Amino acid sequence: YSGLMILTGGPGTGKTTTINAMIHYFEAEGLDIFLAAPTGRAAKRMTEATGCEACTIHRLLELTGNVDDSSANVHFERNADNPLDADVIIIDEMSMVDIHLMHALLSAIVPGTRLILVGDQNQLPSVGPGSVLRDLIRSECFPIVCLTHIFRQASQSDIVVNAHKIHNGEEVIL
């Protein structure tokens, strides 16, 4: 998929700020933007952080049927036969998206739609199969922007500093 871009980075590195900048840019270009996340809580946070309406990926794809441990009873109204009508789709908290949901999302996107996947591959993994974000990053087949500098005010907290040190293989401060 040639319209895919990945934005990744640890906590406090500016992912949300970058999402807001992209939204303003795409709106100024007159493009239709959809915002979504894998959970209701993440979608609500995305709405609050951007001031734009975000929904779950399931709602974006218009889920019908029952969501359970298998995908056998799940059907999405938005699919290859009834694709999403968006110029840009931004998905936050991508680390929680499994292979089945990613397949459904890609099936509902037409060529020319920009898909921007945002997340931290070191955060919560998906409950279902696959590590989609991590695998896409490791594939190096798509443009990846990796934010590394901590901007959030809590950047001086020992927890944030040590989390980044552990990720970088450095000695932690106790």
Task: Walk through the language-model features, giving the residues of each.
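Conserved ATP-binding/catalytic motifs of P-loop helicase motor domains
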Residues: 1-174
